[in-house]
């Protein structure tokens, strides 16, 4: 077999960000009712987003039919691409035909962990030796989903360079920054800005802003006019179905995490 580089395709080791859909109950009726309640008011919000079904929060004796959960997600236009499970769950989790994935979230969910938001950032598993993945977005080495939860990692001393975007972002556009992200134009409805570090928006934010996407709980979002579809830090998010109070809506604000809750505070610029 020739090792000459093909002009038609490449196979490279890599990673890709997606969302975790964390299953916290084996009661499918309750799960279905909550999905409908959460998304019926905003059916287009997560439309066509891909997710990994995370079953690590289930008790040892609990099992869920993953085909049924995949169908529920399809009903709200989310596409399941795999399953994140503890090693002892692999036998039944693999029965649905979805690939087993590894997660890179620093605080691996467990049935005994404190309650978290049901959607977090996740990643597909790194390829085994001798194999290659079809994803091509470079990222840090993935954490083993089966390993015990680690203590929160200290802040990284040397982050990637700040990315500056000096143009407006229209609906459907997405920007991803490995470090901090600075946006000098409006982020329109339907646009999305994502950063592993902080996000600074010196214009109206009307789309989605996700900071600290790889589990950086110290990340913050700053903007001069807050009118968002969604704001998120380290996977903990808030959407338009939870209206913002008048003292921050349309105002200059900073957004940070405090004890796993999003804190939205006015910025005093004068």
From Swiss-Prot:
InterPro entries xrefs: CAP/MinC_C, MinC, MinC_C_sf, MinC_N, Septum_form_inhib_MinC_C
Q: Name one GO biological process term.
A: regulation of cell division
A Pfam family annotated for this chain is MinC_C
Biased segments, Low complexity type:
116-129
- SUPFAM superfamilies associated with the record: Cell-division inhibitor MinC, C-terminal domain
Protein keywords = Cell cycle, Cell division, Septation
Keyword Transmembrane listed? The answer is no
- Positions of the region Disordered? 105-129
Q: Which HAMAP family match?
A: MinC
Protein family (similarity comment): Belongs to the MinC family.
Please describe what this protein does.
Answer: Cell division inhibitor that blocks the formation of polar Z ring septums. Rapidly oscillates between the poles of the cell to destabilize FtsZ filaments that have formed before they mature into polar Z rings. Prevents FtsZ polymerization.
Subunit details: Interacts with MinD and FtsZ.
Quote the protein name from its UniProt record: Probable septum site-determining protein MinC
């Amino acid at each position: 077999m020739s090792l000459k580089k093909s002009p038609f395709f490449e196979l490279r080791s890599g990673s890709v960000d997606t969302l975790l859909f964390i299953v916290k109950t084996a009661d499918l009726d309750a799960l279905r009712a909550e999905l409908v309640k959460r998304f019926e008011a905003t059916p287009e919000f997560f439309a066509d987003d891909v997710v990994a079904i995370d079953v690590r929060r289930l008790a040892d004796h609990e099992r869920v039919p993953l085909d049924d959960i995949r169908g529920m997600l399809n009903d709200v236009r989310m596409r399941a691409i795999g399953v994140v499970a503890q090693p002892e769950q692999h036998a039944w989790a693999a029965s649905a035909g979805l690939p087993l994935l590894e997660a890179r979230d620093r605080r691996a969910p467990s049935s005994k962990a404190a309650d978290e938001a049901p959607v977090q950032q996740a990643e597909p598993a790194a390829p085994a030796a001798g194999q290659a993945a079809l994803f091509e977005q470079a990222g840090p080495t993935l954490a083993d989903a089966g390993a015990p939860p680690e203590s929160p990692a200290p802040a990284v001393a040397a982050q990637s360079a700040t990315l500056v975007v000096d143009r407006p972002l229209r609906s459907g556009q997405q920007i991803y920054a490995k470090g901090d992200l600075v946006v000098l134009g409006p982020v329109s409805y339907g646009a999305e800005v994502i950063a592993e570090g902080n996000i600074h928006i010196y214009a109206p934010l009307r789309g989605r802003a996700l900071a600290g996407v790889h589990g950086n709980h110290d990340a913050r979002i700053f903007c001069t006019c807050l009118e968002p579809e969604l704001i998120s830090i380290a996977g903990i998010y808030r959407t338009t179905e939870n209206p913002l109070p008048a003292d921050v809506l349309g105002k200059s604000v900073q957004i940070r995490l405090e004890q796993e809750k999003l804190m939205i505070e006015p910025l005093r610029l004068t």
